[in-house]
Amino acid sequence: MESFFSRSTSIVSKLSFLALWIVFLISSSSFTSTEAYDALDPEGNITMKWDVMSWTPDGYVAVVTMFNFQKYRHIQSPGWTLGWKWAKKEVIWSMVGAQTTEQGDCSKYKGNIPHCCKKDPTVVDLLPGTPYNQQIANCCKGGVMNSWVQDPATAASSFQISVGAAGTTNKTVRVPRNFTLMGPGPGYTCGPAKIVRPTKFVTTDTRRTTQAMMTWNITCTYSQFLAQRTPTCCVSLSSFYNETIVGCPTCACGCQNNRTESGACLDPDTPHLASVVSPPTKKGTVLPPLVQCTRHMCPIRVHWHVKQNYKEYWRVKITITNFNYRLNYTQWNLVAQHPNLDNITQIFSFNYKSLTPYAGLNDTAMLWGVKFYNDFLSEAGPLGNVQSEILFRKDQSTFTFEKGWAFPRRIYFNGDNCVMPPPDSYPFLPNGGSRSQFSFVAAVLLPLLVFFFFSA
């Protein structure tokens, strides 16, 4: 009898394990690009529109336009890289506004040689300063695209492509497949091309409308998890009611003793600092990243300081510091999540837009620099920081300084989720303290501590 029950138990355990394994395989295989989204921008994506504008004797001419519909994630230098696989034996005769990185084997062609004969071409944007006869609208920005909220006018990129050895009608054309997008690194997942209604174009005088011969769309979504990137930013915290300054977590973006030669750090007190940061090199040499030696080893630190408390308002100071000696950030942006962001009264020296990732939930805001004033975050050094203050109106039903409520729930810099300190380390409200009172000692010591913290 005992052997019967032991065999039954063994069979049940094996069946349970098999069932769990099948569920895991099903859930893994059902993952699609639509699930690779950002919680604070659930509908954000990059949409590519492929418009066939005219037919040629052996193919077609198309205009490909990429729209960055992500609210705050932009594509920085060195820009996007687009790839796909042809459905048949298509070639690219010519391109305007972009180019392939390799020509491939075009040895079977005599006379006119195609621009690219590869089955899986890789396309990049042309650089600024390209001759006008090689440009089209929205091209030639080095692959850089701004986010939709920050600057929609520069959130698109286009190029023209002439395809040969392809179909010459709507019924014979085969759409490319296996699209890939690097922006500039990994993290984007692209879905299949879907044929949609042809795009319509209105002339500048608005008196005539034309349309493409054929149109298909490709949608790409981003996931920081798929990008498998180490964190690039961290958050530190302080407050007027507690002299404790909570720094970024140790090794938040890496540890000094684990850094390789290409990712070395530099002490700010190093003699001849400028010559170490910018050594003599051959033309075209790209220097590896070089960050300031810190406990956290992050290129970017965001400091959130609860500065003042009034009867009906409270004030926060935000400071963004760049610790990267060889990289500055043009048109940077910051996204913060906090329950009181629906009651912003005034923000100083930054642009601001409320984001509502979900209906009825207004706890997320996007901040970015004022053009020609502080939209440029310089490399590490005396000028490598930008700062602003935010004035909030209190909602008496929810406002408190207790249990870390005054600190952000999440911070993103340039679309990357920043490492937060553990909640149990947040500056706490002293015992017996109130919302409007704090110790005299804290008031005296805190400015000194903040000074030494940022000068370190």
From Swiss-Prot:
Residue positions assigned to the propeptide: 432-456
GO terms of biological process kind: cellulose microfibril organization; multidimensional cell growth; response to salt stress
Tissue occurrence: Expressed in roots, stems, leaves, flowers and siliques. Up-regulated in the root zone of rapid longitudinal expansion.
Positions glycosylated per UniProt: 45, 170, 178, 217, 242, 258, 328, 343, 362
InterPro entries: COB_C (IPR056900), COBRA_pln (IPR006918)
Signal sequence annotation: 1-36
Keywords: Cell membrane, Glycoprotein, GPI-anchor, Lipoprotein, Membrane, Signal
Pfam family, one: COB_C
Subcellular location field: Lateral cell membrane
Membrane topology field: Lipid-anchor; GPI-anchor
Residues anchoring lipid (GPI-anchor amidated asparagine): 431
GO CC annotation: external side of plasma membrane; lateral plasma membrane; longitudinal side of cell surface; plant-type cell wall
UniProt key word Ribonucleoprotein: no
Keyword match Lipoprotein: yes
Annotated function: Involved in determining the orientation of cell expansion, probably by playing an important role in cellulose deposition. May act by recruiting cellulose synthesizing complexes to discrete positions on the cell surface.
Note in the entry: A partial protein missing the N-terminal signal peptide was reported to complement a yeast mutant defective in phytochelatin synthesis. It is therefore possible that COBRA binds divalent metals.
Family listed: Belongs to the COBRA family.
Protein name listed in UniProt: Protein COBRA
Native source species: Arabidopsis thaliana
High-level lineage: Eukaryota, Viridiplantae, Streptophyta, Embryophyta, Tracheophyta
